Amino acid sequence: MPIYEFASEEIRPLNKTTFGLVQLKERTDLQRLLRVNISVVAPDTLVIAEEFGDWDESRRRIDILGIDRDANLVVIELKRTEDGGHMELQAIRYAAMVSTMTFDQAADVFARFLARIGKPHTDARAELLDFLGWDEPDEDAFAQDVRIVLASAEFSRELTTSVLWLIERGIDIRCVRLQPYSLDSRVLVDVQQIIPLPEMAEYQIRVTEKKR
């Protein structure tokens, strides 16, 4: 569905563009902007690391690692491409690799991230507890699940088929489309969660709760 500009005398469709054409790079632009505005693709999420890669025998890095209000870890992978590449496969690996993270490890990772972005005196542990609404750490409740958010300009049929298959098997994974438009000298981005559709996600939650 196109996006339109309502002008004084007419309604004009905006011109679709690509992140490449408007010279927005994946890491230095898209990732940097979303890191400080993470609610655009992952509401109620606290970013605790960027380019996270604290594991042995692997040079892989998670674009953005966060935590949600339910103390679930959130792996966020970004692509500016028109098909999403193989980002779902990368994200599954990352989710498995961080699934054993403890609260203390997360607090340490968060502290290093805060120092890197110019907030070395912020108490990472206290801020993490405050975000979760906890008085003290609860390791039994921490990181009981890992959610995956894939954000890309577009997604291939292969990728969306894989994501739907994973959802059917209980994996919390979603696709958020970032479609850029050009308007004069500005770049506008239409952000839409396309899988699962928000209405379907709410329905699935209700069905799951009913089964319990």
Enumerate the language-model features and the residues they cover.
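Charged, terminal alpha-helix-loop-beta segments
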Residues: M1-R212
